Amino acid sequence: MAGNGGIIGPVNTVSAAPAVKTTKIDSSGCHTLETTTSSVDFIAVAAGGGGGSNYGGGGGAGGVLKSFCNSCLAAVPVTGGANVPVTIAAGGAGGNHPGGAGSSGGDTTIVLGGTTFTAGGGGGGGQGGSSGGGNGGSGGGKSGGSAGSGNTPAKPAAQGGPQGNAGGGAVQGGGGGGRGEAGCTDGDRAGGDGIALTINGTPYTLAGGGGGGGPTGDPGTSPGGDGGGGNGSLTAEGSAGTANTGGGGGG
């Protein structure tokens, strides 16, 4: 099971003494802006993919779209008091034993100023030495075949992207991709690290890929990426990604 995504973003308000309000949204719904709000900076994080079983690949992190700290996409102009629809889906399920592939994570969608921004769920990890990782916001790690592609569908910086990176393909049981780096960057089965941001003094680390699994008899675990990626296990079922970070599940 992978960690689901969410929305984090400072809301810029207009008043005699301009203030900035940060709102974190972890569930779907229609959220009403304050009447003084004129623009919104956002970070949208999709749900991570599930890890594969039987030395399966790690799940890819959920895609990340953001206007915050993005020179190519300014804060989105909005009308004060407007409703903002948000959809946040669940993380992908881990693969059934023996040898099942992980499921892709769900998308996160936010509608601001008439524009819909959709971050793609992470790709599921490949299964039991026989399948590649799934494509998604960040790609799932391979078990057989090839690693999943990240930033799928492609989102340029002007639309808040890129969403993420590819899964790892160095070995069977490769780590899932994270927002900050591809899977297997920090080791053969390690999940890719996510992205670290500080918003109004509060640090967030998001969208790490899940660690990959290994053949029966290999000891220990393979680490998930920073940002909620679940650890892969070389002897048992991998761990889930951390809730509300978009982290991928371990293989």
Roles of regions detected by a PLM:
Residues 2-30, 39-251:
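Low-complexity, glycine/proline-biased repetitive segments and flexible coils/loops
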